[in-house]
Amino acid sequence: MISQVERDLSIQNRLPGSDHTTPSPPTSPHLCRSRSKSSSVSGQQQSRNVAHRLSWIILSVLLRRQGILLFAPIIYISCMLFHLHAASFDASPIIHRRPAPGSVYRSPQVYARLRGEIEADNTTADAISTIWKRSYKGVEWKPCVNMSTGVLPVSNGFIFIEANGGLNQQRTSICNAVAVAGYLNATLVIPNFHYHSIWKDPSKFGDIYDEEYFIDTLANDVRVVDTVPEYLMERFDYNLTNVYNFRVKAWAPTSYYRDSVLPKLLEEKVIRISPFANRLSFDAPRAVQRFRCLANNVALRFSKPILTQGETLVNKMKGLSANNAGKYVSVHLRFEEDMVAFSCCVFDGGDQEKQDMIAARERGWKGKFTKPGRVIRPGANRLNGKCPLTPLEVGLMLRGMGFNKSTYIFLAAGPIYSANRTMAPLLEMFPNLQTKEMLASEEDLAPFKNFSSRMAAIDYTVCLHSEVFVTTQGGNFPHFLMGHRRYLFGGHSKTIQPDKRKLAVLFDNPKLGWKSFKRQMLSMRSHSDSKGFELKRSSDSIYIFPCPDCMCRKNKTTASAT
């Protein structure tokens, strides 16, 4: 019969983790005699078995859970992504970036802070009396466009163009058409003015310019007629749309007209070019530039009604500013609703302004600003100098440049956006400000009132004869004026061109002081003075820079004609 000790040992030897896979033999009788030795060996064996058992349990758990280990990386990455996604939503509302200096319209706050100092500035000398005294530096230019006296050769045919855009874009087309006709020895038909839904002006050439004077002035250089001869129109069923039309690329070189247009002109005897805005390169031979000079500076004269009304307003402005020897400042202000809307800039009109601009953009450009992916950045526009100056900013700038409260200013502008509110600060700084509507009666302006180009022509005339011209936004109007003024005033444009990027930063400076601002404005004025004399480079517009193609040095005893 097996003893109890043997049974216990037999059970113990069958547990997982024992040293043997088979049962151990019975204990030696010798070992059984010594209880102490037997107990010691048994304790060591039990301790080892417990450790082995625990190790096996841990290993078996890990082996059974190896499927989880395979998915551990995926689970880890998913948790990290979820955490980052949640963190981004939680963090975005509490990130407050300070707008870049110059990106926010704060000019009203600047004016409120400087207003007292502006009023207290007791400067007696008006800048208008001294502004251009150091301009010429011994270099002066004079008009130098010779007109032909010989007989023109037989014409190669008739060219008919359509001039599109506003007053001065049409003027560009007219001058370029004269140049092309002269270059190709063609006869120019009086250009047709294309009606545009934005300008809404049905005026014809003769309504704006003196047509007879135009034809007579060019008679020995370029033939100009008012219509295509009947014998040619008969071929096209008296319909100009049946005439072969060239769709010329913008800024086409003269070689294109020689190689492509002239052969067709010789074949058809009449051609049409539509549209014709900016269809001739500014980098043209000297002979072609002469035609441009002749057309722009000599042949194009406003029609008698416009010229008379314009000269009347010039005389009124000179009379009002008699204390300054008849000198006045003209400002071309572009703060009409369509300009404000197109600029996509934000001013101080709040929700009402926002709604007005949305409506104006939709009326004028029908979805252009709401296309998918179109991003409007008002702050970036302001930093880049693309926001039109407000009446308030123009006033601050001119006062900083040294023009005092008594200066007479002529404002050339369309209907100013929110005029009652936006014009108040400018009128406060310059109470002698005038517009054509203030200088002329409703009856005097009635023939021009519903025609934007005719009204612009009156503004152009008054600005042309001012002592100082201030441009606040780019465009054809100031560009033509600057060139025309250079032609009249010895090569100097007598024009202030603000650095709008610099102004944006200054008007956004909460610590700006009046003396510091004045220094900055006087520096800007001086820079405009130095840029008054500029010679045309190859790619420049001859309508902005008439020297040296249309002018020659006055201090030379003999000057070669262009």
UniProtKB/Swiss-Prot annotation:
Residues the entry annotates as binding substrate: 332-334
Record: glycosylation sites: 122, 146, 185, 239, 404, 420, 450, 555
Topology in membrane: Single-pass type II membrane protein
Annotated keywords: Carbohydrate metabolism, Fucose metabolism, Glycoprotein, Glycosyltransferase, Membrane, Signal-anchor, Transferase, Transmembrane, Transmembrane helix
Gene Ontology cellular component annotations, sorted alphabetically: membrane
Pathway this chain belongs to: Glycan metabolism
The keyword Glycoprotein belongs to this UniProt entry's keyword annotation: yes
Enzyme class, spelled out: transferase
Location, primary (coarse class): membrane
Keyword presence, Protein transport: no
Record's compositionally biased regions (Low complexity): 37-46
InterPro entries for this protein: FucosylTrfase_pln, GDP-Fuc_O-FucTrfase
Gene Ontology molecular function: any one: glycosyltransferase activity
BP GO annotations: fucose metabolic process
Subcellular location: Membrane
Annotated spans, Disordered: 10-46
Catalytic activity, EC: 2.4.1.-
Residues that span the membrane, as ranges: 67-87
Family: Belongs to the glycosyltransferase GT106 family.
Protein known as: O-fucosyltransferase 4
